[in-house]
């Protein structure tokens, strides 16, 4: 057992990562000279994930370029773990890190991080609900008077917190709740899946041939794609293929032949693959559920455009396989990439409680990226106004309390 590493141009086992191999790998990512290499024995802000501890020590490479480029390489196999520049790290501090609470000491403990985010967002939901309750009560009392005003508050921060809360309070609540649901599982009392989580995908990726049994030699792939930075061995059931990645693109190469050509899974092998999920799960007393396959030429609610995730690669047409099982399963399998999306009742609940509310992936907006982003920007700016005015009121309240306490003494 274990992992074997080979040189890309031979079948000779590669020794442990040495200086020459490290510098050669780094040059693939950035052509600038290396100014410093740090050997890390603990995680830092840009590699905060616990699963990376097995890659220790990790080499952090600094490049002499104006962009402030940094590269993290595993000492175990030379794999690139992180690649970033100064601008990306700056925006991460303003975006991903506070949004996801990606602080190293917390994020490296996955269980603690998950519970922390769930509890913080749950507390946030309670706070927003309380604010909406107060807003409704004030609105009701204000409009009972003889001379009703839109806002009863004269003080600036109170006025703008009240006004922004009226327009954006519900969005702040749904955004906070959906953020919690990004990590929380759908309770089994709502729906208990008939298939174990991930079992369908594991079945479709089972029966993989050994790397040395791929008809297409990986060295021929390297020769055809000299700009490649990474090659992955993949399979759809018995059908082998490679994923070749360079700096900007991904290429899916059929490995069932001795000559490189784009992957194209047939309708028959996709249908047989889905059938295998249910033949492997059933016992002798059970029947295989009804399965229907159709060719989808357009995006729909549960199969949306995710071009950014797949480096702009076209995701249509796709095979849609509908199964008459207790989970109301639908499989979307892209023949040119082998990418599988499995939708069942639980994932539909997840979609409406997280994706739809948090990313505005709603019918009518999914098909128009510009409109969706515009709506999202307006709502996020409004939600930011609610938060900023709320924080200002809280700071002013604490300041007044501290001043009163000082006067007493």
Model-based region annotation:
Residues 1-409:
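Conserved histidines in hydrophobic membrane contexts and catalytic metal-binding motifs
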